[in-house]
Structure formats: C-alpha cells, structure tokens
C-alpha cells in the first residue's frame, strides 16, 4: 500500500509539472570550408551574435533559438546539408548563405519541404525572383550593386577624374557563378541606359589561377575603368596580376565580395589596392549617425570573437537576422502562414538600423528598402564615400 501511494504521488507530481521549454532549432547554412569559407564564416558570426542577443531577451515565442550548422562547401553539398537540417535536425527554418549559387540550390530544397529559408547575404536575382513562397531575403540584391556603381561613376568618379562619364571606357569582368553573372547583367543594362561606353564584358572561372590574359584584353580594349564582380581569391589574383603587368586604370570598382575584405588588402598590399572603389553592404568606416547600433555590434563582435569584424557581411547577417527573429516573436508557430504574417508586418524606415537601410518585404519576399554603400580603399582601410549622408571621406585619385 505504501509503495502504491508513493507511486501515485510521483505520478501526480509529474502530471502537474509544467513541460520543459523546447528549444527551437534553426539551420545556419554557410560555406564553412572551401574557397568561400572566410566570408561564409564571417557571415555566420553575425547570425550567431543576433541569436545570442535574442535569446538573452527571452528567445522567440518563449523558447531559445539553437543554431545547427550546415557546411555548404559547394552547391551539391548545400543541397545535401539543407536536406539533413530539415529531415534529421528538424529545423524550423534555415538562415544563410552568403553564396548565391548555394542559396539558389538549398532554398529549393526548403521550399519543397515547406520550411522557411531566410537569405541574409546572397545577391543573385533568382533567389527571390522565382516566386517561391517560403524564401525571404533581407539584404540588397544584384540590381542594387549595378545601380549604385553606375550612379557613382556618373556623380562622383567621372567628375573627380575631370571627365564626362560618357568619355570613360568601361570594362565589366566577373566570375561566372550566379553572383557574378547577375551583377554583370545589371551593370551592362545600367551602363547602356546611361549611354556609357562599355568596351569589354568578359567572364572567367571563379577558381581561375591565371588572369594575365584578361589583363592583356583590358589593355587592348583601352579600358580606363574596370568593374569587377569577384570573390576573394580572384579579387587578389586580378589586382596582383594587373599590378605586375603595369596595368593601372583610372578606376577599379568592385561589387563587394573580395573587395570588402581587409585580408584582400593585406594580401595584395595596401599600395596596390589604394583608391580602388567598392560598392557593397554597409561596412564599418561610416557616418554612424546614419547607422544606429553599428558601434554596439562591433563591440559585441570583439567581445565574442576577440578581433574586429573582417567584413560588413557579419553586420548584414546580424541586422537581417534580428529583424526576422523579432518579427517571428510576434506570431505563433513557424508554418508558412505564420512566417508570412510576421514578415509582411515588418515596416522599418531607412536610418533606423545598423545597416542604414530599412526593411519592408515586397510581393517576392525581397526587402525592397535594402540598399548599398559606396566605399574606397584609403590608407589600407575601406571608408565610405557615398552617399554623402553616410560618407566620412572624399574620394581620392590613384597615385
């Protein structure tokens, strides 16, 4: 009898106890190894800081967010890792991915599974132009690069060179993945619409080990402005071989990627990259009155990782992830309808985030308020020079 009463008492206690809070798993899908690992890891760091801050304030829908990593070393592995995260880890959503090709591949998997995919850094048009219901992008995309680059050519670079922008001989060179081809396509369109003179448009394999023939082609075309869309290794290779070949155009303009990385400048030499331009997500040498919260992010980053941010990709992922997670905290569940309800309600004006740009998701689930910054390498540092409201320095001519 005594044993029976004890058993009943224990059962009653267990029945009356509140169930333990279950963590919410989210995928963190980036290239953590392979040629894109540096920017992949840098992007993931921003997501990690955002999740830590959200969890410190109670999590999402009362539960802690736990990130589960997936290594998207290439497109095929991105597909395999997305499947694993969904079917084995049972994630409620996937954040990623930095690489456009990997994002396109992996997001198709999540769409078919009905799992939301939140892109925080990849820029290819097709990520959000396919009309997929469960794929959202918080960051600017390929068109925004090209628009800002051509605008800078007309309003800043050509006047500084003492030339009419229509007298410039412009070359477009790009790595041949979704990232490079998307940006280059828009550059060609905007250059044509502006009536500017494009003398060469040429792609190359992203894993190339020799760009000397491309440098010769640029010389032969008489290009005095080069627009390059590239990751880190090909950015370094082009800058090195152009310098070695004595090719010194009046302006080199990168579209993010390797041109936004301090390790790129360190690898080629600060004198080689001096005065090169870069259009990309917000970086750190910027008028912080335009980017509230940026300085606090930098301090959080240094505290967690023991170094300063290596690129603005961490900031971009951080801001996008926080906006999305805070929105999800206002609904119940993570099904397609709940996510749509949460993100459709997001309405943040420009100048209110650490990126400077605002947030509002359009009919394709693209943040239509996302925008780029124009920067230049000066004295070994990447500083903002455009738009004027965000600039901290005037542009310089190469020596």
Curated annotation (Swiss-Prot):
Q: Which GO terms describe its biological process?
A: amino acid transport
Database matches in CDD domains = PBP1_ABC_ligand_binding-like
Sorted alphabetically, which Gene3D superfamilies does this protein's record hold? 3.40.50.2300
Tell me which positions the record assigns to the signal sequence: 1-22
Reading the lineage from the top rank, the first entry is Bacteria
Which InterPro entries does the protein's record reference? BCAA_transport, Leu-bd, Leu_Ile_Val-bd, Peripla_BP_I
Asked whether the UniProt record includes Transport among its keywords, one would answer: yes
Q: Which UniProt keywords apply?
A: Amino-acid transport, Signal, Transport
Which family does the similarity line name? Belongs to the leucine-binding protein family.
The free-text function statement in the UniProt record for this protein reads:
Component of an amino-acid transport system.
Q: What is this protein called?
A: Leu/Ile/Val-binding protein homolog 7
- Where is the organism placed in the taxonomic lineage, from the top? Bacteria, Pseudomonadati, Pseudomonadota, Alphaproteobacteria, Hyphomicrobiales
